[in-house]
Amino acid sequence: MKTKLNIYNMQFLLFVFLVWDPARLVLANIQEDEAKNNITIFTRILDRLLDGYDNRLRPGLGDSITEVFTNIYVTSFGPVSDTDMEYTIDVFFRQKWKDERLKFKGPMNILRLNNLMASKIWTPDTFFHNGKKSVAHNMTMPNKLLRIQDDGTLLYTMRLTVQAECPMHLEDFPMDAHSCPLKFGSYAYTTSEVTYIWTYNASDSVQVAPDGSRLNQYDLLGQSIGKETIKSSTGEYTVMTAHFHLKRKIGYFVIQTYLPCIMTVILSQVSFWLNRESVPARTVFGVTTVLTMTTLSISARNSLPKVAYATAMDWFIAVCYAFVFSALIEFATVNYFTKRGWAWDGKSVVNDKKKEKASVMIQNNAYAVAVANYAPNLSKDPVLSTISKSATTPEPNKKPENKPAEAKKTFNSVSKIDRMSRIVFPVLFGTFNLVYWATYLNREPVLGVSP
């Protein structure tokens, strides 16, 4: 019984093998034939599309206006150059339009092609109005994509790196904000022939990759879109504009400029607490702080374009410079009105005492010599003896002479001007900082959106 079952199983497996293997080969041949047929059909469609196609003529020539729908995907934004007033942006630039000459029928609805086909059909002659330099990436092949739908709608995408102008108004620098435009349109076709339209709304027509910001000194606040028409001697042209809104980060400038300026002003006010007679020390404080402020003002301007107006940082540095220079002038004023105490307070009193003692000693010596010379005669003459005794006897009621008071030394005296400066200078500088930072930090960013 078991032997019969094994025989039946072997026969069944042999039957399946003999039947399935030819069927598999037939299916493989059918799929291969279908692939070959698809390639053949694909080639025939392309050949038929290009048969008699003139890529020198725009779609709808003499009949309708060609509408080009555009949108931008930003893969990298930055860096931004303040000195050159320009920025660099890396984008996928997408254009979409309809060409009735490229309609087709076939087993597929979309033909996915590369850059080779793009050179054989009409494409918009788009250029960037404010672009200084534009590069189309060609590694390892030209980064271009072309898709043709069966109704003649084309999608043309390319990867570009654009270096564009960004006009900046630096009155509020470094608390400033800017709107950098990216303008593009047709170079040869006027609005009566080709017009551009944003594909989506503002948030979708221009998108920035989440990790696309390459900015060290700015925050990318967002973007907006616009459209305008410009007139020239050759006609009216459509110009599409995308604005990228930037707000400068102030941290770098606080560390590099603001804090050193504040510390320099505070250092200049330390001289008010030194003795007014300490001329060398106060002179070093004044001259050093003035030179430091000069160096800071020069270095702060190196990273900026040579504009003809003063920025917010320039005003801050100018006021700090005024405080430092005023401290030096204050010392000069105090020094001018300071009396030299060591020239008359101490030495003149000592010299007067020495002169007085010398005159007394001379008088005593003369008196002693006279007494010695006349002593024998005094002893002989009773009248002279009596007169001598009466002359040498001091008067009991004579009051001692008052000694002249020593002049008060003024070596460690403090000037009234210094006392006032210790209060006035810090209060004024603190008030200035309060008004300055409250004004600029609470101000809404003004984005100069050019038309």
Swiss-Prot record:
Function in brief: Alpha subunit of the heteropentameric ligand-gated chloride channel gated by gamma-aminobutyric acid (GABA), a major inhibitory neurotransmitter in the brain. GABA-gated chloride channels, also named GABA(A) receptors (GABAAR), consist of five subunits arranged around a central pore and contain GABA active binding site(s) located at the alpha and beta subunit interfaces. When activated by GABA, GABAARs selectively allow the flow of chloride anions across the cell membrane down their electrochemical gradient.
Residues bearing glycans: N38, N138
Protein's gene: GABRA2
Principal subcellular localization: membrane
Transmembrane in keyword set: yes
Keyword entries, A-Z: Cell membrane, Cell projection, Chloride, Chloride channel, Cytoplasmic vesicle, Disease variant, Disulfide bond, Epilepsy, Glycoprotein, Ion channel, Ion transport, Ligand-gated ion channel, Membrane, Postsynaptic cell membrane, Receptor, Signal, Synapse, Transmembrane, Transmembrane helix, Transport
Residues making up the signal peptide according to the UniProt record: 1-28
CDD domains found in the cross-reference section: LGIC_ECD_GABAAR_A2, LGIC_TM_GABAAR_alpha
BP GO annotations: chloride transmembrane transport; gamma-aminobutyric acid signaling pathway; inhibitory synapse assembly; synaptic transmission, GABAergic
Activity: how regulated: Activated by pentobarbital. Inhibited by the antagonist bicuculline.
Transmembrane segments: 250-270, 281-300, 312-332, 421-441
Subunit relationships: Heteropentamer, formed by a combination of alpha (GABRA1-6), beta (GABRB1-3), gamma (GABRG1-3), delta (GABRD), epsilon (GABRE), rho (GABRR1-3), pi (GABRP) and theta (GABRQ) subunits, each subunit exhibiting distinct physiological and pharmacological properties. Interacts with UBQLN1. Interacts with KIF21B. Interacts with LHFPL4. Interacts with SHISA7; interaction leads to the regulation of GABA(A) receptor trafficking, channel deactivation kinetics and pharmacology.
Organism: Homo sapiens
Result, substituting L291V: In DEE78; impaired GABA-gated chloride ion channel activity
Protein name according to UniProt: Gamma-aminobutyric acid receptor subunit alpha-2
Domain notes: The extracellular domain contributes to synaptic contact formation.
Segments in the Extracellular topological domain: 29-249, 301-311, 442-451
Disulphide connectivity of cysteines: C166-C180
Pfam family, one: Neur_chan_memb
Protein biosynthesis in keyword set: no
